[in-house]
Structures are given as C-alpha cells and as structure tokens.
Regions:
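N-terminal nicking endonuclease/strand-transfer module with a His-rich metal-binding environment
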Residues: 1-152
C-alpha cells in the first residue's frame, strides 16, 4: 500500500547546500550550539548518493556549466535575478529569475532507506523529467522531546 508524504521543492542555495548536506566542519562551527538541530548520536546513520551521471562536480561547478551551456545555445546570458515588470493593466508583478538547480525536502520515516528515496527519484525522472543529482538522508536532524532527542 502506498504511503502519502510530501516534498517541498525550491531553488537551491548553492553556496550552503553542499556544506549542510556533507556536514563540513566549517558548517558545523557556523551553526553554533544555540541553533543546533542535529542529534549527535544519529550522525552515523546519515546516508548519501551522488548520481554517477553528475560526475565529480560540486554544485557550483555544475551551475557554472549550465550558465555556459545557456549562453552557447541561446547567445544570451542566463537570467538569474528576480525582476519586476508591469502588466497591461499597470499592475507590477515579480518575475522569478532562472534557477536550474533545485532542492527538495522529502518527509521520511525513520525506517526509510536510501533505495526507497532513489526509487522515488527515478519515478520523478520518469513522470516530470526531474533528474536527481544528489540524495542525502539526514537521519540526524530532529527535535527534543522531554530532554531526549527524537528524530524527525
């Protein structure tokens, strides 16, 4: 039987996404003790997968390659910044800039495996043409209940 869940997809903040996902020492220092939302006992259970077609690139390099490809194919620079424009009625609306790399936060159960999420990624690719570049399972993120860590 299928289980209902949700995913929130938004433009990827390339400058901080990989540091957060890989739990770099600099990232861990910068989040500070007061803002800590990680359960240290569960860090060892984190898992990740990098799409072999993605190669050895980091996200910034991949983004720069996309920018070059857009310039080569269209002759124009990729429109990265949000801008405002007026409609025919004079109303001002915001037009989002290009965000070719997006990230999604998927709610999972504690027993969800990396293979389960990879199958979900394959389904997204078949249905909507979204290709997962990286998958990170953060089993160390959570909240505190009664003084004891509880994973989300």
């Amino acid at each position: 039987m299928a289980v209902k869940s949700s995913i929130h997809i938004k433009p990827c903040n390339i400058s901080s996404s990989e540091a957060h996902n890989l739990r770099t020492p600099e990232y861990m220092r910068n989040i500070g003790e007061a803002k800590i939302y990680l359960v240290p006992q569960l860090v060892a259970y984190n898992e990740h997968w990098i799409n072999p077609r993605f190669g050895d690139y980091d996200l910034q390099t991949h983004y720069d390659n996309i920018k070059q490809m857009v310039k080569a194919k269209t002759g124009r620079a990729m429109q990265e910044k949000e801008r405002e424009r007026k409609t025919k009625s004079g109303k001002i609306i915001k037009v989002a800039g290009c965000s070719p790399i997006r990230e999604g936060v998927l709610l999972i159960k504690p027993d969800t495996t990396l293979d389960d999420v990879r199958r979900f990624g394959e389904e997204c690719q078949q249905r909507w043409g979204i290709t997962p570049l990286q998958i990170f399972l953060h089993k160390d993120e959570g909240h505190w209940l009664g003084g004891e860590p509880a994973p989300d």
